[in-house]
From Swiss-Prot:
Protein name: Methylthioribose-1-phosphate isomerase
Annotated site residue numbers, Transition state stabilizer: C153
Keywords in alphabetical order: Amino-acid biosynthesis, Isomerase, Methionine biosynthesis
Source species of the chain: Dehalococcoides mccartyi (strain ATCC BAA-2266 / KCTC 15142 / 195) (Dehalococcoides ethenogenes (strain 195))
SUPFAM superfamilies found in the cross-reference section: NagB/RpiA/CoA transferase-like
Catalytic residues identified in the record: D233
UniProt-annotated binding residues for substrate: R44, G45, A46, R87, Q192, N243, K244
Record-listed E.C. numbers: 5.3.1.23
HAMAP family: Salvage_MtnA
Pathway it works in: Amino-acid biosynthesis; L-methionine biosynthesis via salvage pathway; L-methionine from S-methyl-5-thio-alpha-D-ribose 1-phosphate: step 1/6
Gene3D superfamilies: translation initiation factor eif-2b, domain 1, Translation initiation factor eif-2b, domain 2
Catalytic reaction annotation: 5-(methylsulfanyl)-alpha-D-ribose 1-phosphate = 5-(methylsulfanyl)-D-ribulose 1-phosphate
Length: 334
């Protein structure tokens, strides 16, 4: 399954909201459709969101029918702003938009700018693919033979437009013959673990067990989990990390049980412009994601609901970051 493909100036995405029941690809021909796909999680995962955003901006630019820079620029800015407004937490989205904006700012010929925008989007895609491969290789070195690794949400090929980050580490360790196994949390409320990670683990041939989010502490207490590896949506300058809601709880549990807690993420997820996790904007999603499952109501009507999509794990709970440039370990004093 390919999460994202650029073909003949069209963006082809796998609709991840339908998995694992249906494998359906969507052909997106304009940037509005790309923005909607990002908002509705048809494409998801920080690296994949960044790649889709770049292609969406390129599509929007290709659709601007003028050869005059003075007319092109304000229309382009509308495109970029709409794509950037889709989801507030993932750093990769804003990184992609900034790079595309830089291409426009440095150009003088509209036709060439459009070509350069497509080239930049393809470059971003290739960079994320290569980064995920390197992350997986570095991370696999941390996994010992026979270990059982727990992962949360989905940070595999579907989420990264490439090989995977957290799940890529597990897949790489398996391919090295380390005889490992995995636990995958179902990841409420949208069940990315049950729907997507379980599917990718099954396809990779890795022995695993699917558990509810609240079971993780039980299995840590039983001593059957040797490491936790998760992805990230944004990492602050001090190492505080925003990831899928529930990640912080897992980090606290891992510390309490002496289990290493690793964050696997490309450099595009690191945001040096913010000092700490206090500055990370946490996306609040619609209450129906909690009160309904696939359109079926599971909670009483007219109740208050809180639905933050992410939480922030303080840097002092993270054993190390796994990046395409190597392993970044937490210093003893910081």
């Amino acid at each position: 399954m390919k999460a994202i493909e650029w073909r003949d100036n069209r963006l082809i995405i796998l609709d991840q909201t339908l998995l694992p029941l249906e494998e359906k690809y969507l052909e997106l021909n304009d940037y509005h459709a790309v923005a909607e796909a990002i908002k509705t999680l048809r494409v998801r995962g920080a690296p994949s969101i960044g790649v889709a955003a770049a292609y969406g901006i390129a599509l929007g630019a290709l659709g601007i029918e003028t050869q005059y820079c003075s007319e092109f620029l304000p229309l382009y800015q509308q495109v970029s702003a709409e794509i950037a407004s889709t989801r507030p937490t993932a750093k990769n989205l804003f990184m992609a938009a900034e790079r595309m904006d830089h291409v426009v700012a440095s150009g003088t010929d509209v036709s060439q700018v459009k070509i350069s925008l497509v080239e930049e989007a393809v470059k971003i895609h290739h960079e994320e693919e290569e980064a995920s491969r390197k992350i997986s290789a570095f991370g696999a070195e941390l996994i010992q033979p026979g270990w059982t690794v727990l992962t949360h949400c989905n940070a595999g090929p579907l989420a990264t437009a490439g090989y995977g980050t957290a799940l890529g580490v597990i897949i790489a360790a398996h391919q090295q013959g380390k005889n490992i196994s995995a636990f995958a949390t179902e990841t409420r409320p949208l069940l990315q673990g049950a729907r997507l990670t379980a599917l990718e683990l099954k396809e990779a041939g890795i022995p695993f067990k699917l558990i509810t989010d609240s079971m993780a502490g039980h299995f840590m207490q039983k001593g059957v989990i040797n490491a936790v590896v998760v992805g990230a949506d944004r990492i602050a300058k001090n190492g505080d990390t925003a990831n899928k809601i529930g990640t912080y709880s897992l980090a606290v549990l891992a510390l309490a049980h002496g289990i290493p807690f690793y964050v696997a993420a490309p450099s595009s997820t690191f945001d040096k412009s913010i000092e700490s996790g206090r500055d990370i904007v946490i996306e609040e999603r619609k209450p129906e994601e909690i009160t309904q499952i696939r359109g079926q109501r599971i909670a009483p009507e007219n109740i208050a609901v809180a639905n933050p999509a992410f939480d922030v794990t303080p840097a002092n709970l993270i054993t190390a970051f796994i990046t395409e440039n190597g392993i970044i370990r937490r210093e003893a004093k910081n």
